[in-house]
Amino acid sequence: MKYRYLPQTDQDKREMLETLGISSVEELFADIPEEVRFKGALNIPEALSEPDLVKYFTHLANKNVNFSTHVNFLGAGVYQHYTPSTVNHMLLRGEFFTAYTPYQPEISQGELQAIFEFQTMVCELTGMEVANSSMYDGATSLAEAAMMAAGHTGKKRVIVSRAVHPEARGVLKTYAYGQNVELVEVGINSDGVTDTAALEALVDENTAAIIVQYPNFFGNVEDLGAIETIAHGKGALLITSSNPLALGVLEAPGKLGADIVVGDMQPFGIPASFGGPHCGYFATTTKLMRKMPGRIVGQTKDENGKRGFVLTLQAREQHIRREKATSNICSNQALLALAASIAMTALGKQGVQEMAMMNLQKAHYAKNALQAKGLEIVFTSPFFNEFVVKLNKPVAEVNKGLLAAGIIGGYDLGLDYPEFANHTLLAVTELRTKEEIDILAAELEAITRA
């Protein structure tokens, strides 16, 4: 039982030593002085059998706090949502169980059709004309959008709101450095949204794009109409990073003038799973379509007039024209795009709207419940399913108290925004019940008054 997996047999070892012209493994370390070599047996436990190994790691895993053992109010970019049971059932089918789009699409019509439907649903949600077959995650989608804007406009200045997810801004910074793109951050106002007055002062004719998040990192809904006017008034593109579920109740960015809409499909059928893997989406206009990174599935007809699906506009991609490609990315997240596609299909258009509305309504109930307990809600702007609460103690201390009560608390904004020390970002999804929200309010009141 203990020796189920053997990297090499004694015969293998003898043959390797003979090939090397030595008689023992010790001779491989002849360059290391004898006096500093370790001799004897290592002070480590003996190998475990497979059942004992499984039991050991199960014991370690049970020490973790997770969504099954605790009530979760943590979001900040990764959320706990309902996943229809059909998602995993379909993902594990042999026809679909691959992480990649095929290079011989004519033999993978089912998978290509599923990805085509993914693109179609992304376009419906975002109000855009064309979408690709997915990106790695929301952060890389955002960074790729900025580089696409710089390449299309020929300008090297990008303005990004501080209300965009801090980790996404970090990825953007890495991309910008390599492409010699200047990044300028614009602050937020007292309402927790992008300061449009400061933005207008920063934008000039050398600006390639303005990037905002909708809803933003604090959960608040940005005024895309006002920002669109500022961007297009100076010839810049408007890029929005949007939670796709929120677009079930919010006006589509495309209808508000966005040129590129990106985001993370995690709310649809993709588990939190320690922060990844995820699936980014990327949507734009037909005018910008040939500048878009990633793979695109198109619909066509074969010589018999039957509908078929192909990978189209491949000359944009790295595996065709490396030096002239639109991006270094010529991959995608096909399996997770399929998960999102199945989840959206299972929910349906009305189901997505209802799920989004439940998030909005339950988050607003939570805000009112906390206010009734004397807790301070920082911003008054319209929000989706997250909001900021000011505490009178460090967030880590409060979260420790919540954990003892069986609750996973919010995100510590002070980690990324020094001005928001002792501020927590709470997320409330459709899975939270009235009773759970009431318990959160009572526990927060007790902890902050202790």
Swiss-Prot record:
This is Probable glycine dehydrogenase (decarboxylating) subunit 1. HAMAP family: GcvPA. Pfam families: GDC-P (PF02347). The glycine cleavage system catalyzes the degradation of glycine. The P protein binds the alpha-amino group of glycine through its pyridoxal phosphate cofactor; CO(2) is released and the remaining methylamine moiety is then transferred to the lipoamide cofactor of the H protein. Its EC number is 1.4.4.2. The glycine cleavage system is composed of four proteins: P, T, L and H. In this organism, the P 'protein' is a heterodimer of two subunits. One of its GO terms (molecular function) is glycine dehydrogenase (decarboxylating) activity.
